[in-house]
């Protein structure tokens, strides 16, 4: 029988070294059901990361599985050269829930490509290659997305055709404004934005792109209203606002369907990916028609909106809405916060617990300060696994543990995860 160790050996032989699986002894994922996965050895784990927030409503969800199986028996692929009812129906659903007026959607296979398309639209619409992004941001692995990623451990190159400036925003713990209250913090960030625009731009910036909650950046969560305050300054100068909803969309934050809705702003564009396919590759960019129609040459996507992915997206989005999984995210998120915040406050090496809905993170530092403790983060991550819980890592210094349960997680499953976290914290000491 093949073992996880066998697969790890084969993995290292054929895959690039920059792909680093989790854990000192990597585990295989052989099968899943609901909030649980099993490895090849039959060990069961409670999955609080969902393949980086991508399995969103549970492994092997019956509605998604049935939709994919039904579509696979008809046709797997058509491309955008032909009419496809699943693609059109999914696009209609996304436009309806986007909140963007007169919306159009361009479908892609990944969030990186969605952000690339948004940048193409913005720079074409504004006839400018100048982009604003947020410090500690991550927007993908394609060439253009690397330029707007403010995260040294994820930037493979400094070369770019874009002129990018980074402003203060989401990552409050290490901000020079961290001791300010929400209102003063927001005002200071707006002042920084104005100064960057006045000092470093040529006056015709194309767009700002921002994550409402920074994903790879360790679920760094800005004060509500920050991007709305930015938006007032941007709109005065004709600058577009792009909300990267790859990790925050579809009700994940509980209080809102989209992360941008916490900020009193409607973006000119939003990008999405990950969870809406519940594990099947599906992404896209939504924009007002006048922006989308800026591109007047032929465009094409081989795999974007393919029938199989669209079928998965339709089933996932229907489930999210019909079962009010946004509401469940809010209730379960509050349950998680009530249980874990006292534990985090009492743990000297947890510098900050942050997040909302079903997006939570612990930033792990030297006791009593904010010096990153990457080694202890690794110990905690391994301890969670030993207690049967799969969680993610992230943060600028690799010292953040991220948790993102399924949107339909039950109270019993959540409590099981909380018990595992407490046990892991006790083990690390």
Go through the PLM ranges and name each one:
Residues 1-429:
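Conserved N-terminal phosphate-binding loop of PLP-dependent enzymes in the Aspartate aminotransferase
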């Amino acid at each position: 029988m093949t073992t996880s160790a066998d697969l790890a050996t084969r993995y290292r032989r054929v895959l690039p070294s920059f792909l680093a699986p989790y854990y000192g002894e990597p585990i295989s994922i052989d099968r899943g059901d609901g909030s649980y996965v099993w490895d090849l050895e039959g060990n069961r784990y409670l999955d609080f990361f969902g393949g980086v927030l991508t399995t969103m409503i549970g492994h092997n969800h019956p509605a998604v599985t049935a939709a994919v199986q039904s579509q696979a028996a008809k046709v797997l692929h058509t491309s955008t050269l032909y009419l496809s009812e699943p693609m059109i129906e999914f696009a209609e659903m996304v436009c309806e829930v986007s909140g963007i007026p007169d919306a159009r959607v361009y479908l892609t296979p990944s969030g990186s490509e969605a952000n690339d398309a948004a940048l193409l639209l913005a720079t074409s619409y504004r006839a400018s290659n100048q982009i604003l992004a947020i410090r500690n941001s991550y927007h993908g692995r394609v060439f253009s997305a690397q330029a707007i990623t403010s995260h040294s451990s994820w930037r493979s190159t400094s070369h770019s055709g874009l002129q990018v400036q980074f402003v203060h925003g989401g990552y409050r713990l290490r901000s020079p404004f961290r001791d300010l209250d929400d209102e003063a913090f927001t005002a200071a960030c707006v002042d920084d934005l104005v100064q960057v625009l006045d000092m470093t731009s040529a006056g015709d910036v194309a767009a700002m792109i921002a994550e409402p909650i920074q994903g790879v950046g360790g679920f760094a969560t800005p004060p509500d209203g920050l991007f709305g305050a930015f938006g007032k300054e941007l709109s005065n100068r004709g600058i577009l606002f792009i909300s990267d909803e790859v990790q925050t969309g579809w009700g994940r934050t509980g209080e809102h369907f989209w992360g941008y809705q916490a900020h009193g702003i409607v973006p000119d564009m939003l990008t999405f990916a990950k969870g809406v396919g519940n594990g099947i590759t599906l992404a896209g960019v939504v924009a007002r028609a006048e922006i989308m129609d800026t591109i007047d040459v032929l465009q094409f996507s081989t795999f974007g909106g393919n029938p199989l992915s669209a079928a998965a997206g339709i089933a996932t989005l229907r489930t999210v809405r019909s079962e009010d999984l946004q509401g469940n995210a809010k209730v379960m998120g509050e349950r998680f916060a009530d249980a874990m915040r006292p534990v985090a406050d009492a743990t000297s090496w947890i510098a900050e617990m942050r997040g909302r809905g079903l997006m939570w993170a612990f930033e792990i530092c030297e006791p009593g300060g904010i010096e990153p403790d990457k080694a202890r983060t690794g110990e905690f991550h391994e301890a969670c696994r030993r207690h049967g819980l799969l969680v993610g890592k992230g943060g600028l210094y690799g010292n953040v543990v991220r948790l993102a349960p399924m949107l339909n997680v039950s109270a019993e499953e959540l409590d099981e995860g909380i018990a595992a976290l407490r046990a892991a914290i006790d083990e690390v000491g």
